[in-house]
Each structure stands twice: as C-alpha cells, then as structure tokens.
Amino acid sequence: MCPRAARAPATLLLALGAVLWPAAGAWELTILHTNDVHSRLEQTSEDSSKCVNASRCMGGVARLFTKVQQIRRAEPNVLLLDAGDQYQGTIWFTVYKGAEVAHFMNALRYDAMALGNHEFDNGVEGLIEPLLKEAKFPILSANIKAKGPLASQISGLYLPYKVLPVGDEVVGIVGYTSKETPFLSNPGTNLVFEDEITALQPEVDKLKTLNVNKIIALGHSGFEMDKLIAQKVRGVDVVVGGHSNTFLYTGNPPSKEVPAGKYPFIVTSDDGRKVPVVQAYAFGKYLGYLKIEFDERGNVISSHGNPILLNSSIPEDPSIKADINKWRIKLDNYSTQELGKTIVYLDGSSQSCRFRECNMGNLICDAMINNNLRHTDEMFWNHVSMCILNGGGIRSPIDERNNGTITWENLAAVLPFGGTFDLVQLKGSTLKKAFEHSVHRYGQSTGEFLQVGGIHVVYDLSRKPGDRVVKLDVLCTKCRVPSYDPLKMDEVYKVILPNFLANGGDGFQMIKDELLRHDSGDQDINVVSTYISKMKVIYPAVEGRIKFSTGSHCHGSFSLIFLSLWAVIFVLYQ
C-alpha cells in the first residue's frame, strides 16, 4: 500500500474539519447587513424599479424579514446591521419623510444603523423627529460632531459606538459617515463631519479599554474608505460599509450585478491582520451574510459568506406584508395618476448614469430645456440651450413593459429629492472646470458624472485628472438653425441645472463660486411630468452626447495585453 495514498484521506479530513468545524475555544458571529436601501420598502423589479411581474420581483422588507427570521432561528449569534441611506428614493419617503424607516426597521429588529448622507436630506430636524427619536436600536456615527444649540438638542440621540451583548460575548459597533455629506445633503452648519479614520481611532481605543475585543466598523463612506479604515484603524476586526453600492461576491453571481471583488474582501491592516470588508449592493435586493470566527482573544480566525439574493423563492412575511399594505393606502393616488407612456426602457440605473450617457439623463435634460423655451428675440431661437445634470441625482429606471405607463410614483423614484431646476450664467472656463470635475475620479460610481443636453463632450480617461476633456461643443442660441460650436472660455453662457449643483453639491464648488447669475426655477418632478404629459409618448435615445476617445477605452486593455505578452515571452525563454 502506498504510504502517501494512505495519508491522503486523513489529510483531507483535517482540512475539511478546519473549514466545517470551529477551532477549539472559537466563537462564531453571523453578521446580516444592508446598505443604501433608499426607501425600497416594497419588492421591486430586478433593476430596483417598481415591481412589474410579482413572480420575478425581489427585495422588500416583508421578504427581508422572512430571511432574517430563518437565519435567527437557525444560528445562535446573529447581528442585523444597516450601513446607512435608508432615507430617500421612492414615494414612500416623499410622503412619510422617514417615519416609515423607523417603523419597519423596528419591526425587523435591527441591532444598529450607521448614519448615511441621505439621512440629512430633510435637514437635521427631518432626521431627529421621525428616526432618531423613534428608533429602538442605536444609530451611530463617530465622526459627526454637533455644535451650538444643536449639541444639547441631539445629545444621546446618536452615538459614536455601542457595545452589544451577543450570546455570551459582547461586540463593539463603531459608526462613521462620509465626510463629504455637507456637499451631498443638507446637514446644516451645526454639524461637523470629521475625517473618518481620525475620528474612529480614539473610539476604537475606548472600546479596547472596556475590554471589548470584537469590533465592527459600520459606516457609510464608500468602498475605498471602507478599505482604508480596515487598513489604518487599529483594533477594527470587520468593516461593514455602504454609500458606493458595491457588489461583492464569491463564485457565480446570482443576478446581473458584476462583482467588484470577492466577498468578503480581505484587507491586510498596517499591523498585519486580515480584515474582512463587506457591502451588499443596494435597494434591499440582497441581504449580506457574513460568518466570522474569533479566537479567545478576539482575533479573526476565518470569515466567509455571500450576499443572499432576496428573490421570489423567499416568501414575503404575511404580517409585515399586511402592514406594508396598510401604510400604502396613503400612496395610492400617486401610483394611479398616469402622466404619459414610454415605448423604450428608461435607463436611470447608477451603473449607466454615473459612467456614460443614459437615456433617462437625456429625457430629463430635454424636459429642462423645453421648460425654458422663450422665443423673445428674432436673433435667438431660445435664450438657453444647455443643461447639465449630475448622474447621482437620477435614482431609478422606468420599465416600459408595464404598458409603458409612467405615473407620479415612477417619477418620484427617479427624482426623489424635491429640488428645483435653476437657470445660471457661467463663463465657458467655469463650464470646462465642471466637466473636468465630472470625470476627475471616474470609475468609482460617484454622483458627479454629468448628463447633458445641448452639449457634446469627449473625454480621454488615459490623461491625468484635470486634463481629460478633449472636446467640448455647445449648441448655439444666437442662430436660426441650431448647431454645435466649440466652447469659448471667456464667453458667458446660460445653463439649466439642479439647484443642488448651483449650490456646489457633489463637489461642484466652482459653479457656486463663479456663477454670474442664479435664478430659481420650477420643481424638478413638475418639470419632467409636464414634459411627459405634453409629449404623451416618449422614446429618448442614447445619441452620442457624451463620448470617450479611443485612447481612453483602449488604454487599460492595451496595457494588459502588453504585460501578458511579455509574460509569455519570459516563460518561453526560461
């Protein structure tokens, strides 16, 4: 008998045992997590728009509750966490303004939540009254500091960290929120958003002095910051994040989302530890499921799991569903009022509108310009021809397969913020800066990527940030036949844009600082609904308003091919 063969089964059993059975003295924790749910209380279509075919719909709090309860019954040590941005995104938030978030998160018995930037969309009062005072779970952020009269008003309503008993152990949860929130939302002047890493370290140190040796950083700053926290903050064992809608998955993904990496994503900290980092995409489509094994000293021994797709194979809990239906009565007028029809898919997904021209962006910009038609001078066909719109302001697609019907509820999911479309005057040089800002960190799914109307722009992403706009043409107004001319740096142009951008949102500080005139306009949803009602049937296309130069597209692929070729040559000649 071959000795090597005899040893193989024993070796295999030992390896399997290491995976399937915890090490002696080890303690297991199951972390269930959501992020960026954005008011998707009801089940949605696969693209997170309004549910059309119930047999193919996903998510929703009733289905989430079913899965959470199944796991709680099967496993002993379970935490349910949310990494922020429950607020904003559908007619639910428009009507209930956050009360629905507190009610249904309480019903699901969340253990903790981190504050996201959108929790401040209705100001601090819109956070305090409906959510902070009503939540039966701790709401966390270590890097938000209140000052002035607000400090006493909000004291104790949110915390930097919380120690939670889980089985016979304790787990520390420390929260964080994007320091860019003042540029993304409306927190006011009495909240200071500190650097996440600088603010987190002393709070983690406090937890260590309390003999808490299992610490989760729960927050809303995006995947890049999540990874930095895992690397830089000493004592953090796990990072549960949000904000960037990052989809991580190990193996073949169950739906159309493309993984940005394996789940969990492992970061090696500066002190040599392996720190798992997770997110669960967005819109309640998935429930993050992470198993962590700790040793007696609180060190992570192993971590594994995957997001669970909440598809129709998971039944909706009847009691939660009944509660949803009861709350929904108040929304019915919004869902039955037909504005018009679309005969094409209106792509308002973040995967499109934050990366390239999307036809939803074209529709909205066309509506904005149409709303400003003023033929007052024979020299001008119109007083304004240009629109810019941050892709992050487009929050949902609309499916044409529901008879193409567009309702107020559909539009409220696309434009949930209740802003206005304003008219400003800018120099060409300011517009050029704005378009450079649009792609200065392209590829990170950030909201500043601009959708346009009356503008043709070409980017070269192989060039350094700040020098990526290679062509920028604008539609003339002083002309009888509109055509595109190169942007002139010293000329003053009229542009229609969201008031969010006029006020410097999404980092467009150059617009706020350099605008020459600012006139407030009509509410965004009214502008688009009026346009759709006027047109009756719409079919916006992708028209080449935004292009990327050949070098931009080929740059990364060419480098990869070049390196691969050299690798082959190296191997052949060894």
Curated annotation (Swiss-Prot):
Could you tell me what this protein is called?
Answer: 5'-nucleotidase
Positions contributing to Zn(2+) 2 binding:
36, 85, 117, 220, 243
Cysteine pairs forming cystine bridges in this chain are 51-57, 353-358, 365-387, 476-479
Role, per record: Catalyzes the hydrolysis of nucleotide monophosphates, releasing inorganic phosphate and the corresponding nucleoside, with AMP being the preferred substrate. Shows a preference for ribonucleotide monophosphates over their equivalent deoxyribose forms. Other substrates include IMP, UMP, GMP, CMP, dAMP, dCMP, dTMP, NAD and NMN.
Q: Which sites does the entry annotate for glycosylation?
A: 53, 311, 333, 403
Membrane-topology descriptor = Lipid-anchor; GPI-anchor
Residues of the site described as Transition state stabilizer: 118, 121
Q: Which organism is it from?
A: Homo sapiens (Human)
